[in-house]
């Protein structure tokens, strides 16, 4: 099995569980003006799924040592790419892309593609294996981010004296 594929397959269910019962206020709450809301995290996942991960994967599988631009999430965020979108629409779009990407990845011959390379503009030479591991790592980072936003906003304010023993960092 390709590295990271099991995590990529599991992420939709994990996110579905985290988003179940989420109010609009919770979805759009930001701990600070320069931090992302849960809705923005989901829109980022939707955008990077196709414009980052799948695009790079296609380039490396189809071409010999393609040159790949950096995906600058902070620049996209500053331009409002992740803001003002409906979280359900963003999730549905992401999930459709993820389903297609899983089918694509399952169809690859691991031995034939795992060491294929691309030239990232900042990182230099990367392999399909590197990208797959980063993709799973990226999923897990945003799962952690959503968990921290939820616990900081939904539960921490209502913990009374227990707040003194925790320092949430959303």
Residue ranges of each PLM-predicted region?
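Surface-exposed helix-capping loop/turn segments at secondary-structure junctions
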Residues: 21-27, 106-114, 151-156
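Short, contiguous alpha-helical
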Residues: 28-73, 117-170
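Alpha-helical bundle segments that constitute or directly flank the non-heme di-iron/ferroxidase center
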Residues: 1-26, 48-59
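Solvent-exposed interaction patches of small proteins and small membrane subunits
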Residues: 3-6, 30, 62, 85, ...
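Short acidic/polar alpha-helix capping motifs at helix-coil junctions
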Residues: 4-7, 18-22, 64-67, 79-83, ...
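Acidic/histidine-rich alpha-helical segments that form the ligand environment
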Residues: 7, 11, 75-115, 130-135, ...
């Amino acid at each position: 099995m390709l590295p990271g594929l099991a995590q990529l397959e599991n992420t939709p269910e994990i996110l579905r569980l985290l988003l179940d019962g989420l109010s609009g206020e919770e979805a759009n709450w930001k701990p600070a003006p320069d931090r992302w809301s849960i809705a923005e995290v989901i829109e980022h996942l939707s955008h990077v799924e196709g414009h980052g991960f799948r695009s790079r994967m296609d380039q490396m599988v189809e071409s010999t040592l393609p040159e790949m631009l950096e995906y600058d999430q902070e620049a996209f965020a500053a331009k409002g790419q992740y803001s003002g979108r409906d979280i359900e629409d963003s999730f549905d779009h992401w999930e459709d892309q993820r389903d297609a990407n899983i089918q694509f990845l399952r169809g690859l011959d691991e031995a034939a593609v795992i060491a294929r390379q691309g030239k990232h503009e900042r990182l230099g030479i990367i392999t399909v294996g590197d990208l797959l591991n980063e993709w799973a790592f990226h999923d897990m980072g945003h799962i952690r981010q959503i968990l921290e936003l939820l616990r900081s906003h939904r539960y921490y304010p209502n913990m009374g004296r227990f707040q003194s023993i925790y320092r949430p960092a959303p």
